A protein has these predicted regions:
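Alpha-helix boundary recognition
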Residues: 27-28, 74-75, 112
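Short, basic/aromatic recognition patches
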Residues: 13-32
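Short beta-strand segments
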Residues: 30-65, 71-73, 79-83, 91-93
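Charged, gly/pro-rich active-site loop segments
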Residues: 2-15, 89-156
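Generic structural signal for secondary-structure transition and capping sites
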Residues: 31-32, 78, 116, 136
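Hydrophobic alpha-helical segments typical of transmembrane helices
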Residues: 19-22, 69, 107
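Short, solvent-exposed cationic patches
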Residues: 13, 66-77, 118-121
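A short local loop/turn or secondary-structure capping micro-motif enriched for an aromatic residue
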Residues: 53-55, 68-71, 99-101, 146-148
């Protein structure tokens, strides 16, 4: 982080619940995110995806099995996501897990509530993933100094 952009760390005393609420509000308002995955050759690839978010900060997205991100995720589950753009943004690192069984039904229902037009892709074999958060950073560059804080999540 650039200390000059951040100024004094006034968010050091902000409790975790307040930080999470600010982050959650931004994610809730967003429909699109940039998802970055790693290829089997250890190069990065990024794609725009529609996202939903659960109370526990797990992100939900869908893809088709013939897309590069799907193949990448079968090989390496580590991902990063950028949500929101200027002036406020969330950087999110986590682990992507393909959904199945009862969990798939629950997450798919929630995602289709936010994106009803995505139902048409069911017949094409749409796949759903959840991303379990490890680390999240919030940045708002419209504030002076910039508002920047991080939240870490327990690794399960």
């Amino acid at each position: 982080m650039r200390k000059s952009a951040m100024g004094p760390n006034r968010y050091k005393c902000m409790d975790s619940d307040t930080k999470k609420k600010i982050i959650r509000d931004l994610i809730d308002q967003s429909t699109l995110a940039v998802l970055s995955t790693v290829t089997p050759q250890n190069t990065s690839e990024s794609a725009v995806v529609e996202i939903s978010v659960r109370e526990n900060f797990e992100l939900i997205f869908d893809t088709l099995p013939n897309f590069r991100k799907y193949r990448n995720l079968k090989n390496n589950h580590d991902v990063s996501v950028v949500i929101g753009f200027e002036p406020a943004t969330v950087q999110y690192e986590g682990v992507a897990v393909e959904l199945n069984g009862e969990e798939l039904k629950e997450y798919r229902r929630m995602h289709f509530q936010k994106f009803p037009e995505a139902v048409k892709f069911k017949k094409l074999g749409i796949r759903f993933f959840k991303i379990i958060p490890k680390w999240v950073r919030y940045t708002d560059v419209s504030r002076q100094p910039w508002e920047v804080f991080e939240v870490e999540f327990p690794v399960v």
